[in-house]
Amino acid sequence: MDFRSRLGLLVAAAALLAAGPVAAQEKPAAPAGVTPAAIAQGDSIFHTKGLCYACHGTNAQGTVGPNLTDAEWLHGDGSLDFIVATVTSGIPAEKAKKGVPMPPKGGSAITEDEVKAVAAYVYSLGHK
């Protein structure tokens, strides 16, 4: 192998090594349903008719309900499906933080599509 070939291989290897840490830091793509529009709608519902802010705080960092921004999922795996199921069904008192239950849909009259939007917003908070 001549000098030019070895130099080319060395440069290519250095480029791959340099790209490695950047590629490792990329977060996985959000699941279908977690779109900017769904997140914005969910944010609005969370802070208004969904009443989520009453227990999770206006910054979603928790009050009587748990912090939703720390990527620590207390009752499941943090997947979008898990969040949808949790918002839909709630959390019983015996499993809830501080023993305060989360009623289904947070006790508010939100639709299935609104539940999905809230779930997209919550997903975005815990998967930064």
Language-model segments: which ranges?
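Bacterial N-terminal signal peptides that target proteins for export
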Residues: 1-11
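Electrostatic cytochrome c docking/interface patches
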Residues: 24-47
